[in-house]
A protein has these predicted regions:
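Long, contiguous amphipathic alpha-helices that act as assembly "spine/axial" helices in icosahedral shell
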Residues: 1-69, 98-113, 235
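Generic surface-pattern signal
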Residues: 9, 26, 33-36, 40, ...
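Intrinsic-disorder-associated interaction segments
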Residues: 10-13, 84, 143, 147
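Exposed alpha-helical structural elements
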Residues: 16-19, 90-93, 149
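Intrinsically disordered, low-complexity regions
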Residues: 22, 48-49, 61-70, 75, ...
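Generic detector of intrinsically disordered, low-complexity, polar/charged segments
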Residues: 47, 53, 60-62, 68, ...
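Extended, solvent-exposed, turn-rich assembly/linker loops in the middle of proteins
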Residues: 60-139
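Sequence/fold signature of self-assembling virion shell proteins
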Residues: 79, 125-235
């Protein structure tokens, strides 16, 4: 309404109205964004959990799902000594295993909430204090290090390893209701040799691409998204 009222001529108002109608009825773009969101959610869930269910029978979908197992090895999966807390000893066990196997860790991916909780722990405070050359004892009340200080101290202690903090929310819609959630499992830390390439994004040709259904309009977006729109005209 604001756009229409600001138009100076009837032709301008008509042009703006046509653009608004086109935008509202542009199902292809809306679906494309939804596919991007689902891909992002699957990526983050799969990387943190090692398993995803594509369009499955979970709390966000109905019907039969496709279970994808990333094949994380049990000997490469570690727990923590104290439930709900990540310590330097927990991290060192993973790094030591990687080194023994001839692998190197450069990045640790984790939820921002988990990172902040870890930064407030006693071992993180002591790590930052040691990095700054500060002397302390068991009675010293050390401050919580800033993110910058903790990252620098951690990188210095663990041969350049850095943190990649995840705080991504994804919005999905079901039965006309939009809900946001965070697909990364906050209970998981993933140790990677590099954050530049953690896998490949591949796709194939769908059956409908070569055998379209009558009465269905198809649109291909970004080379791999086949979006269909069905319409019916009653007499």
């Amino acid at each position: 309404r604001a756009h229409l009222s600001n138009a100076s001529t009837d032709a301008a108002k008509k042009s703006i109205l046509n653009r608004i109608i086109t935008r509202v009825l542009d199902d292809g773009t809306a679906c494309s964004i939804g596919i991007d969101e689902r891909n992002e959610a699957n990526f983050l869930t799969g990387l943190s959990d090692g398993i995803i269910i594509v369009e499955g029978d979970d709390d966000k979908n109905t019907g039969i799902g496709l279970r994808v197992d990333y094949g994380y090895l049990s000997e490469h999966s570690f727990g923590v000594v104290t439930t709900g807390e990540v310590t330097g000893d927990d991290i060192e066990r993973v790094i030591s295993k990687a080194n023994d196997d001839g692998n190197s860790i450069s990045v640790i991916m984790l939820a921002l909430s988990t990172y902040n909780k870890m930064r407030q722990s006693q071992w993180a405070k002591e790590l930052a204090a040691n990095y700054q050359g500060q002397t302390f004892n068991n009675d010293t009340k050390l401050p919580v290090p800033t993110s910058t200080l903790f990252d620098e101290a951690f990188s210095d202690q663990y041969n350049g390893i850095s943190f990649l903090k995840i705080d991504r929310s994804v919005t999905y819609e079901k039965n006309g209701r939009r809900v946001s959630y965070k697909p990364w499992n906050a209970n998981k830390l993933i140790f990677l040799p590099s954050a530049d390439n953690v896998g490949s994004f591949v796709w194939g040709t769908l059956a409908e691409a070569t055998n379209p259904v009558n009465g269905v309009e198809y649109t291909t977006v970004d080379e791999y998204k086949l979006i269909s729109r069905y319409s019916k005209t009653d007499p």
